[in-house]
Amino acid sequence: MIKIENMTKSYRTPTGRHYVFKDLNIELPSGKSVAFIGRNGAGKSTLLRMIGGIDRPDSGKIITNKTISWPVGLAGGFQGSLTGRENVKFVARLYAKPEELKEKIEFVEEFAELGKYFDMPIKTYSSGMRSRLGFGLSMAFKFDYYIVDEVTAVGDARFKEKCAHYFKERHKESSFLMVSH
């Protein structure tokens, strides 16, 4: 279960404070996937970023005893001067047990299908290559909840099919928190 209590999130704008949420209370049940659907700017992605710990509310709290992924396929957090392998190793050190480190790196290397680019700096990657690496990294770890903000597959038809297969496998044991318009 994920419980949100009295959560407020706002941003400063030239015309004053814009509230995305004000005293939001919601409970997301365990074992259920939830889709947040709404117009652009409604706060769907902001809510998922806060649930995933990427953004913080102004006030209130998010309570859970479940593991929650970062947004699936998120490629914006990579360090450009490090190689794909080095970036994956950094994340794996945070989320994996020491004895799983090699396995996680090998999984992402195989999944992303970047070949020699896996050992090149990420700043040399195309956006599609970054997305493949990000998606592979997301699938390397098992979470109770996966955050899915719009894009769930990248690349050609075969790679999209591969991504869909992994999504189905993860959905057997995990729940998804999804955003769509």
Regions found by a protein language model. Give the residues of each.
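Class I S-adenosylmethionine-dependent transferase superfamily signal
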Residues: 24, 167
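ABC-family P-loop ATPase nucleotide-binding domains
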Residues: 10-15, 67, 72-158, 164-165
